[in-house]
Each structure stands twice: as C-alpha cells, then as structure tokens.
Amino acid sequence: MNRSVVAALCLAVLASSASAQSFGGQNQPPDQWVMNCNMEKGRDCTVSAMIDGGPNNLLGTFLIVSYSVAYTTLTVVVDGVGQRAAMQVDEWPWVSTGICTGGACSFDQQKSSDLLQALLKGQRMVVQASLQDDSMAGPLPMSLSGFATQYQRAVRAQQAK
C-alpha cells in the first residue's frame, strides 16, 4: 500500500511538473529539476527531482527531493516508510532529517535553509534514506545543474498574485 501511495505521489509530482514545464513543450524525465506550483492548500511552488536509482541500485529504487518555497522546507520522499534521510552537497558533511512521516522525511527549517544555500551554490548532491524495514535507499547521486534556475522560477511564481 505504501508503495502505491509513493508511486501515486511520484506520478502526481511528475505530471504536474511536466504540465508546469509545458511552455517549452518538453516533459521532464527523472534526474532533472522541475518547478511546480500547487494551489490545493494555497499557493505552494516547489523545486523537485525524482532521482532514479539506475542500473547499479535495486530495481525500482528512487527518491524524490523537493524544496517548498512557501514552507521553506526541504523534503525527501521515499518508496516505503522512512526512518531518516540524509543529504550531502559536494564535499560538505552529511545532514540528516529529524522528522519522517510515512514516506516523507523533512529537514527542519534551519537545516532546510542551510541546505538550500548549498544546493544553490553546489555542483552535486547525494541522498540516501533508511526505511522502517531496515532497508536503505541510496546513496543516490544527483547533479545540481538547473536547480538554481528552477528555484528562481519557483520564487517568482510564489510571489505572483
């Protein structure tokens, strides 16, 4: 059941991100940063990427990393029930989440702010998550190319009336 919920969330993020990107006429594949605005509970523009585990990881391994401009929170969505997620930008130390609810592990506001600055300036990040069944997703690498551009688009869209 949790796998279905995460898969549905992943599809919703990708579908809404692809529609937000339709001005360029391109759908966004995994491993690319996209901007999306959701109006369900008030305007919330996010920058997110679905990081595919690729051929060197377990079949179907993926994580979604998403930064909410409205809530100024960085979240890692896992396929399963998360216990903890961690992120490393370039050669900086690993930073871990303190809050996991279901498949979503969020960094607190201070860590989210610090990581946002690192993501804006960095070249590459690595994300991993430990799950309640003691399995591990990752470490999964992701380029930060395009993150800053999509973040600026999200900020402008968030401020639009």
Model-derived regions: residue spans:
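Bacterial N-terminal signal peptides that target proteins for export
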Residues: M1-A7
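A generic "folded-domain core" signal
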Residues: A20-K161
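Bacterial N-terminal signal peptides
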Residues: A7-S16
